[in-house]
Amino acid sequence: MRATSLAASADVPCRKKPLEFDDNIDVECPVLKRVRDEPEPGPTPSLPPASDLSPAVAPATRLGPYILLEREQGNCTYRALHCPTGTEYTCKVYPASEAQAVLAPYARLPTHQHVARPTEVLLGSQLLYTFFTKTHGDLHSLVRSRRGIPEPEAAALFRQMASAVAHCHKHGLILRDLKLRRFVFSNCERTKLVLENLEDACVMTGPDDSLWDKHACPAYVGPEILSSRPSYSGRAADVWSLGVALFTMLAGRYPFQDSEPALLFGKIRRGTFALPEGLSASARCLIRCLLRREPSERLVALGILLHPWLREDCSQVSPPRSDRREMDQVVPDGPQLEEAEEGEVGLYG
C-alpha cells in the first residue's frame, strides 16, 4: 500500500523534515560491502515458484554470492537466493546515491527482536542492495482473510507491535506511515511479528519530534496531520496509527472509512468512531487511549505496554462476527483499494 500525499487537505505547504545524522551509530549495523559487477536486475522468464527454489536454479542476476530473481512487490523488491546455503532472502534495491538516507535508521537503531534489519548490504557503482530474511506474509492480509482477530491473539501480536514502536521512539526514530502491512510474520506459524521498511523513518537528533511532512496513508493518518497546524508530534502520530491498527485487528474494519477522501478526512478530524460490541472493557479502554483527537492525551508507545489489556488474560473474550458482515466496511484487498479507503505513572507523556 502506497502512502498518499495529504498536503492538499491542509492549508500549509508540505515540508519534509530533513534527515540529520550524528555519530550515534549502532555497531551491529551490517557492514556495507562493495560489489564489482552490477547488472541491472530485471524480470526473468520461466522462473520456478518459491517452493521449488534450490541452489541449482539458473541464474538471473548474479550479485556476489546471491542470485536476484523476479520482483516480489513494487519496483525495488526482489526474491534473492544465497547460493552457498540455498537460503532465500528478500532484496531491496535503491539508487546508490540514497545509501546514507536508507541506512541511517538501521545505523541508529540497536537490534530488536521485533524490528527487521538487513542481514547484508552490498553497494555497487549505481545501486544499493539490502538483503532481509524471508518473511511469511503481513498482518494486513491475515486480518482481512479472517475479518478480525480474537482478543487473545490480537493482544499477543499487538504487544509485539507496540514493543517495536517503543524501541524505535526510544532511539529517536519516527516511523510515519505506520500500518498493518508494515508488520510481517517472521515464522511460518504467524505468531511472531517484525516491523519492516524503516527506510522512510525520520531520524531525530534531539527530544523535539516535530514534523512538517503531510505524507501518510489515508486510513491511518492522525487528525493533527489533516489540520492547519504547521507541525505535529511524530511520536503521537505513530501512536494514533497504532490505534487504527488495533481497532482494525479486533473489528475487521477501519474505525474511519469513506469512499470519498474528503469525507474520510472529515471523519478523522472529528475523531468519532463506534467500537464493536463484544470487546472487553480493557480493550475498549486501550483503543480510546490511542485514538484521542488531542495528541498530548494519547498514551506514549512505552505506556501501551503497561496497559492492563496487554497484561491480563482475555482468552474468554472475542469480538462478535455480526459486526463484520458489512462488505463495504471490511479491510480491503490489495494496496489500491486500501489506499482509496483509506492511570499509572508513566502511561502518558
Swiss-Prot record:
Its main location: nucleus. Induction: Expression induced during programmed cell death evoked in neuronal cells by NGF-depletion. The lineage of its organism: Eukaryota, Metazoa, Chordata, Craniata, Vertebrata. Inactive protein kinase which acts as a regulator of the integrated stress response (ISR), a process for adaptation to various stress. Inhibits the transcriptional activity of DDIT3/CHOP and is involved in DDIT3/CHOP-dependent cell death during ER stress. May play a role in programmed neuronal cell death but does not appear to affect non-neuronal cells. Acts as a negative feedback regulator of the ATF4-dependent transcription during the ISR: while TRIB3 expression is promoted by ATF4, TRIB3 protein interacts with ATF4 and inhibits ATF4 transcription activity. GO terms for cellular component: nucleoplasm; nucleus. SUPFAM superfamilies: Protein kinase-like (PK-like). GO terms for biological process: cellular response to insulin stimulus; intrinsic apoptotic signaling pathway in response to endoplasmic reticulum stress; negative regulation of DNA-templated transcription; negative regulation of fat cell differentiation; negative regulation of fatty acid biosynthetic process; negative regulation of insulin receptor signaling pathway; negative regulation of MAPK cascade; negative regulation of protein kinase activity. One of its GO terms (molecular function) is enzyme binding. The protein kinase domain is predicted to be catalytically inactive. The gene is Trib3. Interacts with AKT1, AKT2, MAP2K1 and MAP2K7. Interacts with ATF4. Interacts with DDIT3/CHOP and inhibits its interaction with EP300/P300. Interacts with APOBEC3C. Interacts (via N-terminus) with APOBEC3A. Interacts with RELA. The keyword Transcription regulation applies. The keyword Nucleus applies. This is Tribbles homolog 3. SMART domains: S_TKc.
